[in-house]
């Protein structure tokens, strides 16, 4: 009798685990960002029109760099917008825009420290 209960529990656990992995693989950025920012920024999601999208999808659908605050075509665009200092292009060559990052080198961090008083 205990084996029947254990077998039923194992089947339920297996079903729940398979559903969890299917949903996780299908919709990586499926939440809304109305009141809080995207929780899936670690996997490359950003908020656009109160819905979280993949970053490369935002870049591919954009008509200009003004469509999203992190889109850029050069490092100067990132610096002008104040969203970073490095424009990284996507690996997909169909995307004509890149994504702004904050990249700080050791020399950039020490430039004010080494000034003579």
Swiss-Prot record:
**Which cysteine pairs make disulfide bonds?**
29-45, 33-47, 38-52
Q: Which Pfam families match?
A: Albumin_I_a, Cyclotide
Q: Which residues form the signal peptide?
A: 1-25
Establish whether keyword Signal is in the entry: yes
Entry's PROSITE patterns?
A: CYCLOTIDE (PS51052), CYCLOTIDE_BRACELET (PS60008)
> Which residues are assigned to the propeptide feature?
56-117
This protein is called: Cliotide T9
Question: What organism does the UniProt record list as the source?
Answer: Clitoria ternatea (Butterfly pea)
Taxonomy-wise, where does this protein's organism fall, top ranks first? Eukaryota, Viridiplantae, Streptophyta, Embryophyta, Tracheophyta
